[in-house]
Amino acid sequence: MEKTIEDPPTSAVLLDHCHFSQVIFNSVEKFYIPGGDVTCRYTFTQNFIPRQKDWIGIFRVGWKTVREYYTFMWVTLPIDLNNKSAKQQEVQFKAYYLPKDDEYYQFCYVDQDGVVRGASIPFQFRPENEEDILVVTTQGEVEEIEQHNKELCKENQELKDSCVSLQKQNSDMQAELQKKQEELETLQSINKKLELKVKEQKDYWETEQLEHLKKENGHLFLSLTEQRKDQKKLEQTVEEMKQNETTAMKKQQELMDENFDLSRRLSEKKMIYNALQREKERLEGENDLLKRENSRLLSYMGLDFNSLPYQVPTSDEGGAGQNPGLVYGNPYSGIQESSSPSQLSIKKCPICKADDICDHTLEQQQMQALCLNCPICDKIFPATEKQIFEDHVFCHSL
């Protein structure tokens, strides 16, 4: 029999409460050679009855409870306990499960209640040596063996007396058992009658309960059909809501994209507007400077600004003739209209008598007015490259 994974039944029974003499171990060696299987032989006493969960364990000498076993094997139950050969039993421990040290161990027979019923003499697991082969027995050892033999004989007599007492107890228990069996048979007969009555009552109850369950099942089936219809309608409604939600999300995303694009374009327009506003303010400042310089020169020459034929029209008079696509009007319209040679009046300087003072001043004003300066990097563009100037300003906003 191989060792099983199932743990044997144990208990916390102490040594004083065990009956070591009910199972006797035979042919136990003083030591066993490691690496080999060990056969354990034992004999049941006359009044001992083995049970299915009895087991034999190998314990280290000095153990206190049966839970301290090193390994164990289940006991094989004999077929006929009355047969003499059935009293002689043996189990074989495989070498793999045996201890590997040289401590002292012993076999112990433990019943299914966790009570020790027999124990062997101590033995070791170690190789054979010359001291074990040559045995010298002294007179003292012989006397000790004889004394031990006498003690065993005395214990044997006590066991016989105990056996007689146990046999008497067994007879009494057999009579009691017979009485209990008769009572058990009576109770079993009553129990069968009750079981039959219960079965009849149960069949009647089950039939009635089955009819009730059938009716209830019909009602539940109708209710389930209606619920499935409602569920189908709800699923259709949910699907429509999902489609509407998807459409709304797409529309929202389109609006967000459009809003983002408009925001970006607005930001670009704002930057262009700010740049043109700064350019307008700069041109207005330059225009004011040029007007003051022109007035100063005209007063220096003894002329009146209002009497000049190339006066720059005011915003009220020239607004209608300007390009409607320009935000601030064309700042060069007055200069272009007054740049005709026929309208220019050449004056001589009253001090140095120079006759090119107006042409020289007018040329400087025309050069300054015909240039476009970037309000961000101050780069200068000719007035003819207005589209390039606007693209350049727009690039600063990217």
Curated annotation (Swiss-Prot):
Zn(2+) binds at residues 374, 377, 392, 396. Keywords: Autophagy, Coiled coil, Cytoplasm, Cytoplasmic vesicle, Cytoskeleton, Membrane, Metal-binding, Phosphoprotein, Zinc, Zinc-finger. Transmembrane segments: none annotated. Disulfide bonds: none annotated. A zinc finger (UBZ1-type) spans 371-396. The keyword Zinc-finger applies. This is Calcium-binding and coiled-coil domain-containing protein 2.
